[in-house]
């Protein structure tokens, strides 16, 4: 499969999985009433409405702030999709697809609910990770993929320079 269709497929899969988990947890379970639901000694499901971005940064409690975050998410998704259309590798296209799917998933939440629904809480002892969702995980994995691709490209360039010398 060529990079662009692959990246778009990854974006669509990320978006569908994100929205399906959110809708299922909000409307098909009693999580909003019975939280937290303990999955393991280190993981639980909770309901958190995040009006900001990752890690709860840039909290927006106004309609203007909400719609600015929606606009930034949509513009980022468009720009990353344009980048995806020009890439030559499935790795890079897939990484971009994870970010695009996650950005659109969280934008849908902001449009529908005024905030992003986060629900996975990981913790151990006194340590607690921020509460996140599938879209957030997709964005983080996508950024990791971009970093991996950059390191891989740098190594490839270094090998080519050495072989030319």
From Swiss-Prot:
Location in the cell reads: Cell inner membrane
Under which EC number(s) is this enzyme classified?
3.4.23.36
Membrane-crossing residue ranges in chain numbering: 64-84, 91-111, 127-147
Catalysed reactions, as listed in the record: Release of signal peptides from bacterial membrane prolipoproteins. Hydrolyzes -Xaa-Yaa-Zaa-|-(S,diacylglyceryl)Cys-, in which Xaa is hydrophobic (preferably Leu), and Yaa (Ala or Ser) and Zaa (Gly or Ala) have small, neutral side chains
GO MF annotations, alphabetized: aspartic-type endopeptidase activity
One Gene Ontology term, aspect cellular component: plasma membrane
Q: In which pathway does it act?
A: Protein modification; lipoprotein biosynthesis (signal peptide cleavage)
Keywords from UniProt, A to Z, are: Aspartyl protease, Cell inner membrane, Cell membrane, Hydrolase, Membrane, Protease, Transmembrane, Transmembrane helix
Main subcellular localisation: membrane
Q: Which family does it belong to?
A: Belongs to the peptidase A8 family.
Q: Which HAMAP family match?
A: LspA (MF_00161)
Q: What does this protein do?
A: This protein specifically catalyzes the removal of signal peptides from prolipoproteins.
What is this protein called in UniProt? Lipoprotein signal peptidase
What species was this sequence derived from?
Methylobacterium nodulans (strain LMG 21967 / CNCM I-2342 / ORS 2060)
